[in-house]
């Protein structure tokens, strides 16, 4: 009985408000990734876009690999109007989620057979907003709970993230198939409906941010000038890291900068292969 109670106490942490918030925010974070990578390549190939062009379009996903470049700005830069009302973390979360929703609606309004460039720009907006959301969400998670609670928050975050990836992968194909009905062949309207549904799903994250408390912010040193602010936000973190680890810092920073590139650029070509071989109905 004691062991059973111990298990109940362990599982109870996952029903706490903080854990449920991270479940919803994890869903919001995981939703856009496939929609600008694997799922988008599926749509484009079914629309008859050649594989070379699809390969080039995978470069929009490099926003995830290089998000460390603007991470210091997200960490320190206040947003006029929003930061005063929501706080530093929630303001960036809300802005990034609105960017993602707007970008997905932009993608849903396009026909890649007629005009591919607007879709690329919309996908860039989604990728940039998603990468920015990842930055702000990591900071929010770390600052909103004690060290003892971080494991539970990370677990619920990953659960929400993986559920969203299933929805943004298989779920999109299911919605598109329902929207297509009995029509045979490629139907752009089906994909537009599916991406519109995905944009609507971003409401999960937006509502969660608006209802969540802002974590206690850590104090930032005052900056007397723009130059000093830029130095403390962009230069000082890297300088401190290099001072601590010296030559090993270059290896670590290099790995951080490039480890996702192969996954982002090469993994996107799997779905065009499936479309060519078996088609959407059998995937």
What residue ranges belong to the model's regions?
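Core transmembrane helices of Major Facilitator Superfamily
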Residues: 33, 65, 125-137
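C-terminal ends and interior cores of transmembrane alpha-helices
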Residues: 79-80, 91-114
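Short amphipathic helix-loop junctions that connect adjacent transmembrane helices
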Residues: 32-54, 259, 268-280
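Central cavity-lining transmembrane alpha-helices of secondary-active solute carriers
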Residues: 53-80, 100
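Intracellular loop-helix junctions on the cytosolic face of multi-pass helical membrane proteins
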Residues: 1-16, 108-120, 132-133, 145-265, ...
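Intracellular juxtamembrane helix-capping segments at the cytosolic ends
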Residues: 40, 131-145, 270
